[in-house]
């Protein structure tokens, strides 16, 4: 079995869903107000320590991790769903660094420990959020914000076990 203790990967968090620009339409309501819903939040990229892994060999051929995007808003003030996070399993003792700046983002030493490495984008607001006393029927909505994109350097720290030896007399 080959042992890999340092590798570079790329993670991309999800983009937020777009807000909707829509208006209320009913049979006997001539001028319905704005009814566009907000977009959902993009998925985060989370690193989780897994007991079943002991090397970074799994990342050798799978170097890009992308979270899903949030859903767009819809008519009748319906919000878009938030995207689920992308869980990346790493071995115990993994040090996560930003490959561009060298900043340490996380030191994952305990089993089950989690760290949010890349945050997902915020969802855009629908036109119902922009209605006020001066503009009661806005025709615009916001786009969702993009998620974070990071190049990471994963390093596996050496774990030394203590063994006691007795001398024979």
Q: Where do the language-model regions lie?
A:
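Conserved small/polar residues in nucleotide/adenosyl-binding loops
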Residues: 163-169
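Conserved P-loop NTPase architecture
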Residues: 1-162
């Amino acid at each position: 079995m080959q042992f890999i203790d340092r590798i570079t990967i790329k993670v991309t968090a999800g983009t937020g869903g777009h807000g909707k620009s829509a208006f209320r339409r009913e049979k006997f309501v001539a001028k319905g107000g704005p009814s566009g819903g907000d977009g959902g939040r993009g998925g985060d990229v989370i690193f989780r320590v897994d007991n079943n892994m002991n090397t970074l060999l799994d990342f050798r051929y799978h170097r890009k991790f992308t979270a899903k995007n949030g859903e767009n808003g819809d008519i009748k003030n319906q919000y878009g769903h938030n995207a689920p996070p992308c869980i990346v399993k790493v071995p115990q003792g993994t040090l996560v660094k930003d490959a561009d700046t060298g900043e340490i983002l996380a030191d994952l030493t305990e089993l089950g420990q989690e760290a949010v490495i890349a945050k997902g984008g915020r969802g855009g607001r629908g036109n119902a959020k922009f209605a006020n006393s001066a503009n009661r029927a806005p025709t615009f909505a916001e786009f969702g914000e993009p998620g974070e994109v990071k190049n990471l350097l994963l390093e596996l720290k050496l774990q030394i076990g203590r063994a006691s030896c007795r001398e024979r007399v």
